[in-house]
Design a protein with these regions (language model features):
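Glycine-rich FAD pyrophosphate-binding loop
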Residues: 26-41, 180, 192
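Dinucleotide-binding/catalytic capping subdomain of oxidoreductase cores
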Residues: 157-275, 345-353
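Short, conserved catalytic or adaptor-binding loops enriched in Gly and charged residues
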Residues: 60-67, 113-115, 179-181, 237-249, ...
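Short acidic, glycine/serine/threonine-rich loops at helix termini
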Residues: 43-45, 87, 109-113, 159-162, ...
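Conserved Rossmann-like nucleotide-cofactor binding loop
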Residues: 13, 38, 105, 155, ...
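Glycine-rich dinucleotide-binding loop and its adjacent helix/turn
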Residues: 107-181, 302-307
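Conserved N-terminal/central alpha/beta ligand/cofactor-binding core
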Residues: 38-39, 43-97, 106, 115, ...
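Rossmann-like nucleotide/phosphate-binding core characteristic of flavoprotein oxidoreductases
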Residues: 1-8, 12, 16-31, 46-50, ...
Length: 405
């Protein structure tokens, strides 16, 4: 009897999970179920649109569906409430094993009064808007001239880079030309950690150095940077800046904690920070972008270290361990969960009457399911719609995506 496994979520965790399961227990039927009509989740909608090298992992994931027999069932919303097409209980009735790999998408908040005011944006939502995610098209952020980015990790530098680049800097990307930001003249990137505690990588700083229209500055001198490649890269970038040709000035601030937002007429006017020694600093701004991670407090299920929620129900990726780790780190995580599932299957988790798996989904939802072949048609439509200098023109609404099938 072939065990039927459903993976909920077609992002990197879900795809790595399918890869790992294919190796750990090759004689199973695997179906990846996705709420959106398109696969690849975070890779498609969360990776910066000018980082096509990172997005290239999609080619690896495509082999799951093209050569390894994994099923894709898009446009099926598993969950609770009126928006759901299928409850988790119903899904478990038709699959022997269910793995939750839906990730996290809610931006972590600063915890300041006025944070939900216009002009204060989470980096996750902004990145999804720039990546044409159907659920974030109403965001339409207005950045103005002066932007404060709160956070000092790689995502914060992604935001800075995408705000500072000009239209020609996005050649080869899938960034919609209509969404290139041209209004920003001043960016302040502010982190609560001292410089040596910053979370960004040196390669991300070096990318800033390639933006000819960007003048990079420091709010205070860096100290003892000889053993720190990240800070050396930052110092080199500051030294190489060409202020006379700069369109945008970027200033790094380290060791400042967000204290208060100044709101007037439902718009942010400034943000105040406090240092460890109690000093205060206020930065005027037209918008604030927070890049301080994702909120995992709303996770409904928590698994053990092996990703086990209960017998037959597992979790992986950020859904399992919270918003930590890179795309490659998800691969290692799913290998551990897959081995546990393989062991449980060997111990008889699927004993009893045969469950129908993907066949039951097809019977219930019919042609409303988006298959992998349907995705290939969508993919072709987007590639053919690419603007000059772009690699694709993404469809921005679920309705438009489904019309391409």
């Amino acid at each position: 009897m072939t065990s039927k496994i459903a993976i909920v979520g077609a992002g990197p965790s879900g795809c790595f999970m399918a890869q790992s399961l294919g190796k750990a227990c090759p004689d199973v039927e695997i179906t990846i179920i996705e709420k959106l009509p398109v696969p690849y989740g975070l890779v498609r909608y969360g990776v910066a649109p000018d980082h096509q090298g990172t997005k290239a992992v999609i080619r690896q994931f495509a082999r799951l569906f093209e050569k390894q027999g994994v099923n894709f069932a898009g446009n099926v919303n598993v969950g609770a409430g009126d928006a759901a097409d299928l409850s988790l209980a119903e899904l478990r009735d038709i699959f022997d094993v269910v793995v939750l790999a839906t990730g996290l998408s809610e931006d972590r908040r600063l915890g300041l009064a006025g944070e939900q005011t216009g002009g204060v944006y989470g980096s996750g939502a902004v990145t999804r808007f720039w990546n044409d995610h159907p659920s974030d098209q109403a965001l339409a952020p207005e950045f103005g001239n002066q932007v404060v980015v709160v956070g000092n990790g790689n995502v914060a530098l992604d935001v800075v880079r995408l705000l500072a680049k000009g239209a020609d800097d996005f050649n080869g990307s899938d960034f919609d030309p209509a969404r290139v930001v041209t209004s920003v003249t001043d960016i302040h990137i502010v982190g609560r950690s001292p410089a040596h505690g910053a979370k960004f990588d040196a390669v991300m700083v070096k990318e800033l150095a390639k933006i000819g229209s960007l003048d990079v500055r420091l709010d205070a001198p860096l100290c003892d940077i000889q053993e720190d490649k990240r800070l050396q890269a930052l110092q080199d970038t500051v030294a190489a800046a060409a202020p006379n040709t700069a369109k945008t000035v970027l200033t790094f601030h380290f060791g400042w904690v967000p204290e208060a937002l100044d709101i007037a007429h439902n718009c942010v006017r400034s943000i105040t920070f406090r240092s460890q020694d109690g000093a205060m600093k206020t930065l005027p701004c037209d918008s604030v972008v927070t890049a301080i991670g994702f909120d995992d407090s709303r996770r409904e299920f928590v698994g053990d270290g092996d990703g086990v929620i209960e017998r037959g129900l597992y979790c992986a990726g950020w859904f399992k361990r919270g918003p930590r780790g890179t795309i490659p780190e998800n691969r290692h995580d799913t290998q551990k969960v897959a081995q546990r599932i393989a062991n449980d299957i060997a111990d008889g988790i699927a004993k009893g009457h045969a469950k129908p798996g993907i066949a039951a989904l097809k019977d219930r939802f019919g042609e409303s399911i988006v298959t992998y072949d349907d995705w290939l048609a969508i993919d072709c439509t987007e590639i053919n719609a690419a603007a000059v200098g772009r690699c694709r023109g993404k469809l921005k609404t679920v309705g438009d995506i489904l019309k391409a099938v």
